[in-house]
Amino acid sequence: MSTSSPPAGTHSAAGATGGAPGDAAAGGAPDLEVAVIGAGPHGLSAATHLRRAGVQAHVFGSPMGFWKTMPEGMKLRSNMSATSMVETVGPLSLTTYAQLSGAQIEHPVELSDFIEYGSWVQRTAVPDLDERMVSGLARTSAGFALELDDGARVSARRVVVACGIAPFERIPAGLGLEGLPAERVSHTAHHRDLGAFAGRRVAVLGGGQSAFESAALMRERGAAHVEVLVRKPSVVWLRGHGVKKRIGRLGPIVYAPTDVGPLWYSRLVEKPGLFRQLPREAQDKIAARSIRPACSHFVRVRLGEIAISTGVGLRGAREQDGQLRLSLTDGSEREVDHLMLGTGYKVDVSRYAFLDDGILAELRRADGYPVLQRGLETSVPGLHMVGAPAAWSFGPINRFVSGSWFAGGAVAREIAGRSSGRPVGGVRS
């Protein structure tokens, strides 16, 4: 996998801070020591660890915003320990939240419970959250200039990007899907209420959790017929906690609480510092094995009324007589009302629309991922990226909530170690 610094794209520059109070470009102190962009699990974790380390961190974004767009009724695949953000044990863990709130939470964790938990973490650890969105980010001589969605401009010495995977939807190319209307083709990420497909015939393309769970939820909410089309010859069915129960006391030894990766690999990917020392070929192999498309047992048992076709892919799709006609790679066709793409996400940080051309030109990348160094810092000094974009440099754990334990701490240690107590001007809401 080659690394590169692609030429600048079509992003608009945020510009300078325009003489705002504390304008670093004008020679004064920046408004903020650290700006965290994003208020999901990774953003909240980074901010919490920074504040615990004595570093001022100002967080922008909608609390748990991406999670609030996910399908109602969804459940998290991760085990209880791995569903904690910030830390697996401590005052902000899922267990502590359940004890303090009285919430009855068990595996698999309901999406609604997880959103409530994340909102509690935000209220507890980042009560001063700034819900304005960052629309532009550019370099200045002393750090960064941020443009907000209300037109305000602020400056920051460092920036942590924790914006998740929303812009990274994977849409298969070469199938003619781009010209079809949204009422015919959509991604699983586009739907909060899958009851909207009641009475309709739907084909789902994909072989992982999102494809199968979306199929189950649609059928349970009244879809007339649902079929899942899986390109690979078989489906990877996860066996739940059966294996851990069978191996007894060995379970905690070979399976890390982060719950990422299969037997033995789990303990390796739990240690990003160790993982990144492996040869690139080994990293890629282990990462692919750890995040391969698979379906949880708790979803599998709900698929009794779902048609599943394996070893078949999509060749093309066209509207005909008010329906959508799918041409499949085995020569057969399907006539449906809607095609849903459960095709996951492909990281490409150039799709973060707020990054300006200057940053993109300087940002070293590998297959769409930023190439990160210690403290999850990019090749742009002072710019850090956490969450899924960190997976190429620090392993697959960063794609998951449990990766926030590592990333938040690593960013905080690096920034706190460089902090000299320099003054900042503050920011007005």
Model feature map: region roles:
Residues 68-101, 255-276:
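Flavin (FAD/FMN) cofactor-binding and adjacent substrate-gating region
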Residues 2-11, 15-64, 107-209, 213-221, ...:
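Flavin (primarily FAD) cofactor-binding/catalytic cores of flavoenzymes
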